[in-house]
């Protein structure tokens, strides 16, 4: 193990030596200034989502958002991703090419809430949509279902306005339950996944989609 200037350990097997780590994080203040932009972008986005949630609750007597969780990529994750893509380890390159440094996962009550929130965000005039990947209408082969948006939104500081990219994942409670446990089974145990387990995981994903459909149907009956 090696340690960079910020006391963060970077595994040697990830291909980063001390020099490479410190080229990106050579100055603590510069790093903090850059990451402040991403932290503030998360706050700005969460505020917009909370406003939409409260407005919807007032109009429909329920909340479309069950929970939100935000995160910033760790320095080692950022550097490893840049190295895998053959990018120079500097801040301008990082900011221009790594679009998922800041991320928000939004867990919604129903599938229709996912698309409602996505539309509301896309309709906001100062938000730029960088990418949109609809894995709900077109699930991944393993059954994964979620709507991914990469957006760029303005963050207003005392003397400047900066447009910062944020990755948003919107999914239902049922999908989040499946995705969390699937990730644990597939990656945390560090064991090979055979065809039988793959099939069962896919069946569980299909079941979670069936639950979503049934619960949404019941919602419409009751409303």
Where are these regions (language model features)?
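Generic solvent-exposed, charged/amphipathic alpha-helical segments
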Residues: 42, 46, 50, 79, ...
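Terminal, regulation- and interaction-focused segments at domain boundaries
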Residues: 102-107
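An acidic, glycine-/histidine-flanked metal-binding catalytic module
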Residues: 2-42, 46-55, 166-223
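Generic alpha-helical secondary structure
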Residues: 34, 38, 42, 75, ...
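Solvent-exposed loop and beta-edge segments used for protein-protein assembly and interaction
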Residues: 41, 98-100, 143
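A glycine-rich, hydrophobic loop/mini-helix early in the fold
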Residues: 55, 60-101
């Amino acid at each position: 193990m090696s340690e960079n200037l910020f006391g963060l350990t970077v595994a040697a097997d990830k291909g980063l030596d001390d020099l490479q780590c410190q080229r990106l994080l050579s100055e603590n203040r510069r790093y903090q200034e850059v990451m402040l932009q991403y932290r503030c972008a998360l706050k700005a986005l969460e505020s917009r989502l909370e406003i939409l949630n409260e407005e919807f609750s007032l109009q429909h007597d329920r909340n479309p958002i069950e929970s939100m969780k935000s995160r910033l990529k760790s320095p080692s994750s950022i550097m490893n991703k840049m190295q895998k893509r053959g990018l120079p380890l500097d801040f301008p390159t990082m900011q221009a090419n790594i679009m998922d440094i800041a991320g928000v996962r939004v867990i919604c009550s129903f599938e229709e809430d996912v698309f409602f929130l996505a539309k509301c965000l896309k309709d906001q005039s100062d938000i730029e949509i960088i990418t949109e990947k609809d894995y709900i209408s077109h699930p991944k082969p393993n059954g994964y279902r979620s709507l991914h948006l990469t957006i760029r939104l303005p963050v207003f500081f005392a003397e400047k306005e900066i447009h910062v990219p944020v990755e948003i994942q919107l999914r239902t409670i049922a999908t989040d339950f499946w995705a969390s446990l699937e990730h644990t089974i597939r990656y945390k145990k560090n064991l090979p996944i055979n065809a039988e387990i793959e099939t069962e995981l896919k069946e569980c994903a299909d079941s979670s989609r069936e639950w979503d459909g049934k619960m949404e149907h019941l919602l419409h009956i009751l409303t």
